Amino acid sequence: LDGIYVSHTDEDHISGVRELLEFVEKDLTSLRIENLILPKWSDIQENKNYRELTELAESAGVRVLTVKAGDEIRYGTVRLKVLWPESTASGKEVNEDAMVLEMISKDFKGLFTGDIGMVTEEKLIQNGCLEDVDFLKTAHHGSRYSTGAEFLEIVRPELAVVSCSATNTYGHPSQDTLERLKKSGSRVLITRDCGAVTIVNGKSVSAFNRIK
């Protein structure tokens, strides 16, 4: 893998990455990871997950990169624009300080929003960095406090994926959020129902549910 992007350090966003890094560290897999990319936060002293994840990556021989709004990473013809966090982010509000990425290739634009809420969506709107996209990774598992109507009027995704567990106790995804997505004209896939979603070259979409 060229890189694994971690939007923020809540346990439900890093547990799988941690396990994978442990396998690499112990040489239990042939998989190799070049980079671990994290949001650049000014205050990580009290963020145990952040510190331990970076230490594990370094022990596994994986380069750790931190990014902020305005940074850009390229893989051939693919560009990854970092829209958030802002340069002054402390990381104390892990959801609102989460990494937001726009992926741009020849025929595809995708937006990955971590667990940000409408507060950060409004800041992104004010910054003028949002645009119409083909794909949206819906923020915060479809929480009612994310993916607002004004935000959707700008990004207008053709496909929106909501990542959530069938057994989550938070009521995700919110019916309000699903209605806003449908009103914006988006096709909606919920991993709770369809399993993992894979997009190839921005053209083909497939879902795979290994649980029968």
Model-derived segments and spans:
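Non-globular, low-confidence helical/coil segments that flank catalytic cores
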Residues: 1-212
